[in-house]
Amino acid sequence: MTGKAGEALSKPKSETVAKSTSGGAPARCTGFGIQEILGLNKEPPSSHPRAALDGLAPGHLLAARSVLSPAGVGGMGLLGPGGLPGFYTQPTFLEVLSDPQSVHLQPLGRASGPLDTSQTASSDSEDVSSSDRKMSKSALNQTKKRKKRRHRTIFTSYQLEELEKAFNEAHYPDVYAREMLAMKTELPEDRIQVWFQNRRAKWRKREKCWGRSSVMAEYGLYGAMVRHSIPLPESILKSAKDGIMDSCAPWLLGMHKKSLEAAAESGRKPEGERQALPKLDKMEQDERGPDAQAAISQEELRENSIAVLRAKAQEHSTKVLGTVSGPDSLARSTEKPEEEEAMDEDRPAERLSPPQLEDMA
């Protein structure tokens, strides 16, 4: 009995050792429970109780062998040849299932799916985070490149009133007018220039809405004249002789006249432009009323008084120079007519031809 049982025990042990060595997979250790020792758990058949015994410690191995041996209890072991024949003779399907490659590849293949998805998800999240970082960096660079916005200037009612008055007088004020406005309104000159640009744009927009194309053309011509210091065309000046309202460019002439009046007030009115435009027509005087006529008469009186004062100053200067020069000036004045008479006598003699001289002789 003991020999046969030893052969039966030794045979599956050798087979399991050969299978474990041929498969290349190490023997897996199990617990110390009775079910695990007897192989009653739900693990695959590869975890044979004999293979589990090989992985046990020496003390536990002796105890397990004493239990499994045929002389363990009354000469008959718990596991005899007829007790559990499945542990001694393995069927073909158990041998196929006992292959370590087939056993271990399935869980690895199953686990590879979630691992791949987790890797792709992590890579996608990294790509999204990197793209977000790039976008944030580009947005920061764009904000740095942008210029800082200047605060809008808030004009007071007094400043707006003065600016509107100046705009009604001339849409293109020169440097002198802008400096005077800066002194009045206590604003910088560049702010005044920007205000005039915006006001001109607003005026053009309003005129376009009303459909005044001729006025817009005159406005563009006036702006070019002011920028490039171009005089008024002669055709416009000739048409102004009949009257500003009857001319081909009434708005342009009115603006030009306003600029001339502003220059006259500042004392920089050119003499050529004074004679270029005629005085105001009767129609304009009637439209403006008695107040405008009184203002014009006052301006004329002022100009006349200035001219009279200049004439008196010139007369006084000539008198002073005459008194300072004294008798020298008188001698020069007496010498001049004598020289003129001598020249008159010499001139006909020079002009006479020889036959005329013979006739005279």
From Swiss-Prot:
Span list, region Disordered: 1-28, 104-151, 262-300, 313-361
Tissue expression per record: Abundantly expressed in retinal neuroblasts during eye development and in the inner nuclear layer of the adult retina. Within this layer, expression is stronger in the outer margin where bipolar cells predominate.
Domain CVC: from-to ranges: 208-261
GO cellular component, one term: chromatin
Record GO biological process: cell fate commitment; central nervous system neuron differentiation; negative regulation of neuroblast proliferation; negative regulation of transcription by RNA polymerase II; neuroblast proliferation; positive regulation of cell population proliferation; positive regulation of transcription by RNA polymerase II; regulation of transcription by RNA polymerase II
Motif OAR mapped to chain: 304-317
Origin: domain of life: Eukaryota
Annotated consequence of substituting R200Q: In MCOPCTI; loss of DNA binding capacity at consensus sequences; abnormal and prolonged expression of MITF and WLS; mislocalization of CTNNB1
Main subcellular location: nucleus
DNA-binding region: 148-207
CDD domains from the UniProt entry: homeodomain (cd00086)
Chain intervals with Basic and acidic residues compositional bias: 266-290
Subcellular location: Nucleus
MF (Gene Ontology): DNA-binding transcription factor activity, RNA polymerase II-specific; DNA-binding transcription repressor activity, RNA polymerase II-specific; RNA polymerase II transcription regulatory region sequence-specific DNA binding; sequence-specific double-stranded DNA binding
Effect noted on mutating G223R: In MCOPCB3; the patient also has cataracts
Assembly information from the UniProt record: Interacts with MITF.
Role summary: Acts as a transcriptional regulator through binding to DNA at the consensus sequence 5'-[TC]TAATT[AG][AG]-3' upstream of gene promoters. Plays a significant role in the specification and morphogenesis of the sensory retina. May play a role in specification of V2a interneurons during spinal cord development. Mediates differentiation of V2a interneurons by repression of motor neuron gene transcription, via competitively binding to response elements that are activated by the ISL1-LHX3 complex, such as VSX1.
Family: Belongs to the paired homeobox family.
Disease: Microphthalmia, isolated, 2: A disorder of eye formation, ranging from small size of a single eye to complete bilateral absence of ocular tissues. Ocular abnormalities like opacities of the cornea and lens, scaring of the retina and choroid, and other abnormalities may also be present. Microphthalmia with cataracts and iris abnormalities: A disorder of eye formation, ranging from small size of a single eye to complete bilateral absence of ocular tissues. Ocular abnormalities like opacities of the cornea and lens, scaring of the retina and choroid, cataract and other abnormalities like cataract may also be present.
PANTHER family to which the protein is assigned, alphabetical: VISUAL SYSTEM HOMEOBOX 2 (PTHR46892:SF1)
Annotated protein name in UniProt: Visual system homeobox 2
Encoding gene (name): VSX2
